[in-house]
Amino acid sequence: MLVPPINLHAWVEQHRHLLKPPVGNKCIQQDGFIIMIVGGPNARTDYHYDEGPEWFFQLEGEMVLKVQDDGTARDIPIRAGEIFLLPPKVPHSPQRAAGSIGLVIERERLPHEQDGLQWYCPQCNHKLYEAMFPLENIETDFPPVFDHFYRSLALRTCMQCGHVHPAPERYAAIEA
């Protein structure tokens, strides 16, 4: 059975209250593709690794897509009304401004594919940690990996330069 068209602007207005931290991400359709609306602000320090391409359409406000490009960290600004197709296998970290809203489309993973979350040293860009896993639910599969990384001072300490990757405030008691 065909799903009727979705009025995207009306959907955003009706669900705007859900597009806020800590999650800020709502899947609106999933059938071959994962179609999400994502609101800002966010303060992600991880990089997502996807074996398929990801399509970004910035509806409101702006974002910066931080990417790891041949061992170099660089920023790709995406403003309201702009689209960007991220090629497969490019580690990326979406940084969304307060009040921003974007549409992200990813294809559903093939059975043999793994998603990944990676962290890089903010001082020297050395890879600190990477976890690969089969993605089943983007809203529930990421948090346990975040917890594992942020709760470990050893994982967050750069073996190359000694810098300690900061953890979000809710993990502050771990460092005490």
Swiss-Prot record:
Species per Swiss-Prot/TrEMBL record: Xanthomonas campestris pv. campestris (strain B100)
Family per similarity comment: Belongs to the 3-HAO family.
The entry's keywords: Dioxygenase, Iron, Metal-binding, Oxidoreductase, Pyridine nucleotide biosynthesis
UniProt-recorded name of the protein: 3-hydroxyanthranilate 3,4-dioxygenase
UniProt: O2 binding residues: 44
A biological process term (GO) from this entry: L-tryptophan catabolic process
SUPFAM superfamilies found in the cross-reference section: RmlC-like cupins (SSF51182)
Functional description taken from the UniProt entry: Catalyzes the oxidative ring opening of 3-hydroxyanthranilate to 2-amino-3-carboxymuconate semialdehyde, which spontaneously cyclizes to quinolinate.
Residues the entry annotates as binding Fe cation 1: 48, 54, 92
Domain of life: Bacteria
Pathway recorded for this protein: Cofactor biosynthesis; NAD(+) biosynthesis; quinolinate from L-kynurenine: step 3/3
